[in-house]
Design a protein with these regions (language model features):
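Outer-membrane beta-barrel "beta-signal"
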Residues: 194-195, 293, 346-348, 375-387
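Structural signature of outer-membrane beta-barrel channels/translocons
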Residues: 49, 65-67, 98-102, 148-150, ...
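Gram-negative/organellar outer-membrane beta-barrel architecture
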Residues: 35-43, 49-189, 271, 283-286, ...
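Transmembrane beta-strand segments of outer-membrane beta-barrel domains in Gram-negative
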Residues: 111-113, 118-250, 320, 324-332, ...
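Solvent-exposed, glycine/polar-rich loop segments of beta-barrel outer-membrane systems
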Residues: 177-181, 265-277, 333-345
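Short loop/turn motifs that connect adjacent beta-strands in outer-membrane beta-barrel proteins
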Residues: 30-40, 68-76, 102-107, 154, ...
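Bacterial Sec-dependent N-terminal signal peptides
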Residues: 1-26
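C-terminal outer-membrane beta-barrel translocator/porin domains of Gram-negative envelope proteins
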Residues: 204-318
Length: 387
């Protein structure tokens, strides 16, 4: 697949209280549950992209941050909308909500997604080749709902629901897809019902400087609500250590597993995205299990340079980042150190909402170099941290 090059057309920071002179520096030393002024913010990020299979892609990433009450210790809530359309009549809409309420005792998340977008399918396992890619048209409907309640201290318990329907059709006859025997090759549907346990004592959920977050979700897809009876396990750990007033080291590990007698290829855990194993095309490697870990160093930077342009008045603050990771996809009978692949890169963050510690993130990452291919890499422009 031709690499998509994203170009930021413009940055519009339209937020209440964005004026830097009115904000306290809450980033360098913030204890758990830091009290900060509650301010709403809205950040739209228009982007343009081009690739031969999509043509010209026009879209935006918009994030609205707000608080559900005046409780000074309440975490901020967010609504994130990402719409995009292409000149090849393709469309995607992704809406995510992350709501905190009742003194952080209740936490609700949702994801509504529809896309009619092409993807590259490379095959199964961790030895796929770029030359074996087949371009597929993928139409997806997705509804994901999660609710968690504090049961004591820093512990939460909750329930989750995921419905997803996929349709696939090969756009070309080359590559590995036409001749592969795959479960639900043309698509299917699944409904996962799950239970979640969480430990969370982070000082802030957006740009964390100290604390730990551990999440385990076990979900079951019953046969009468899904095409196949399946089990899914998702576990993740995040731990942050402040090593100076301006610098932090974060550790992140995850494990995803899909179990059942017949496993649809499009539900298999995939390596690579803007959150973990940056530098790899999502789905370049996929298999029954996925295990990965990463370390990221962040250094807070305040150049103390005021900017006054028309109605924008700010004193921008940044963070520099360096990260490294290793991960592997594997089946139940075949895990070895040789499966693990590298990922490393550099990035910069801009705090567009200092009170809530919301950032715009730019990362460039490199992955492995397979024989006869260029080294895998990726450029990422995102709203929010990788972890």
């Amino acid at each position: 697949m031709q690499r998509i090059i994203f170009f930021t057309a413009t940055l519009l920071a339209l937020s209440q209280g964005l004026t830097a002179q009115q904000q306290k520096d809450t980033l360098q030393s913030a204890p758990a549950d830091t009290i900060v002024p509650h301010k709403r913010s809205f950040f739209p990020l228009p982007v343009l992209g081009y690739s031969p299979e999509k043509g010209l892609e026009i879209g935006a990433a918009m994030l609205y941050s707000f608080y559900t009450s005046k409780d000074p210790l309440l975490r901020n809530s967010t609504i994130n909308l990402i719409p995009a359309i292409t000149t090849e009549h393709q469309l995607k809409i992704d809406l995510k909500t992350d709501i905190w309420t009742d003194a952080n005792n209740w936490h609700f998340k949702s994801n509504l997604r529809y896309h009619d977008f092409p993807i590259n399918f490379y095959g199964l396992g961790d030895t796929t080749r770029k030359a074996g890619a087949t371009l597929l048209d993928n139409k997806r409907y997705k509804v994901q709902l999660e609710a968690e309640h504090r049961i004591g201290g820093h512990f939460y318990a909750g329930l989750s629901l995921l419905f997803q329907q996929d349709d696939y059709k090969a756009r070309e006859s080359k590559g590995v897809y036409p001749d592969m025997s795959l479960v639900d090759k043309d698509g299917g549907h699944v409904t996962f019902i799950g239970a979640t346990g969480i430990f969370d004592n982070r000082d802030n959920q957006n740009y964390t400087r100290s604390g730990t977050w551990v999440r385990l979700n076990i979900s079951y897809a019953p046969g009468f609500l899904s095409k196949h009876e399946l089990w899914k396990i998702d576990g993740q750990l995040r731990h942050f250590i402040p090593i100076s007033p301006k610098s932090t080291v974060g550790f992140n590990g995850l494990f995803n597993s899909l179990q059942g007698s017949r496993l649809p290829f499009y539900l298999l855990p995939e390596m690579g995205n803007d959150l973990m194993m940056r530098g790899y095309y999502t789905g370049r490697y996929r298999d029954q299990n996925y295990l990965a870990g990463q370390v990221e160093y962040r250094y807070f930077l305040n150049p103390k340079i005021p900017i006054n342009i028309w109605f924008v008045h700010m004193q921008p603050k940044f963070a520099l980042a360096a990260f490294g990771a290793s991960g592997a996809v594997f089946n139940n009978k075949n895990i070895a150190m040789s499966h693990f692949k590298p990922s490393y890169g550099l990035g910069v963050r801009w705090f567009y909402d200092e009170g809530a510690r919301l950032t715009m993130r730019i990362d460039y990452a490199w992955g492995e170099k397979r024989s006869g291919e260029q080294r895998q890499s990726g450029l990422y422009l995102s709203l929010a941290e990788a972890f």
